[in-house]
Curated annotation (Swiss-Prot):
GO molecular function annotation: DNA binding
Database matches in CDD domains: SfsA-like
Source organism superkingdom: Archaea
PANTHER family linked: SUGAR FERMENTATION STIMULATION PROTEIN A
Family designation: Belongs to the SfsA family.
InterPro entries: SfsA, SfsA_C, SfsA_N
Pfam families for the chain: SfsA, SfsA_N
Gene3D superfamilies attached to this UniProt entry: 2.40.50.580, 3.40.1350.60
Descriptive protein name: Sugar fermentation stimulation protein homolog
Length: 226
């Protein structure tokens, strides 16, 4: 039995209240963005490991939510890529992915030297997110990800222990029509991805779109045929 359940187009996976429009002034470091809100300069936490060059740059539009952080009172939630808004907060990925799984899963399952996002029966499921789309191709990663490559190797090795591994991509960009690993940004991940898929790691690619303050399921896509 598949570990996944089907959702229809337009299924709402997450909704936020009272998001705040902002404009980026600068990216202070990997996790902090300086921005303007109603002519006031504020600092916001960016909980996204990606490089995000296409989204986080001076003058671009983002949406923030109020938080009770120790250092910052705002968190970046959505960023605009020139076409549409994308989700840029990794804290919500697991919750969104879980809405496409049958009941009975375990979160943060420890296997070998890693924690895999989900275990469901014999299925190991690792979740990654993607916002970069070029020529209708969803591309991951947007920066070198040693952690992502390591997870692929762990999934591949799990087959010999009787597991059925999946890598699941949540693509928060409705322009995506197919998926390809981003060889230009990370050739090691790309090569490992193709090797893993060829040798028994299954893949799943779910596309989402954002309207107002809510995220909806759009469609499932396949790998690009180059």
């Amino acid at each position: 039995m598949s570990p996944f359940i089907k959702r229809g187009h337009g299924f709402m996976v997450l909704s936020f209240e009272n998001l705040i429009d902002a404009v980026i002034v600068s990216r202070i470091n990997r996790f902090v963005v300086k921005c303007m809100v109603n002519n006031e300069e504020v600092y916001a936490h960016l909980h996204d490991p990606g490089r995000l060059n296409e989204i986080i740059y001076p003058g671009n539009k983002i949406k923030l939510r109020k938080t009770d952080g120790k250092k910052y009172n705002y968190s970046v939630t959505f960023g605009h890529d020139g076409f549409n808004y994308t989700l840029n907060d990794a804290r919500f990925h697991s919750m969104i992915a879980s809405q496409f799984l049958r009941l009975g899963f375990k979160k943060e399952y420890k296997y070998m030297d890693s924690r895999i996002d989900f275990l469901l029966d014999e299925y190991l499921i690792e979740v990654k997110s993607c916002t970069l789309v070029n020529s209708k191709k969803a591309m991951f990663p947007d920066a070198v990800t040693r952690r992502g490559t390591h997870h692929l190797n762990v999934l591949l090795n799990s087959i010999q222990d009787g597991y059925r591994p999946y890598i699941m991509f949540l693509i928060f960009n409705e322009r995506a029509e197919c998926f390809t690993p981003n060889k230009c940004r990370d050739p090691e991940f790309s090569g490992t991805f193709y090797r893993a898929v060829k040798n028994g790691v299954s893949s799943k690619f779910l596309v989402f779109y954002i309207r107002e303050n809510s995220i909806y399921f759009d469609k499932e896509i396949s790998m690009c045929v180059d």
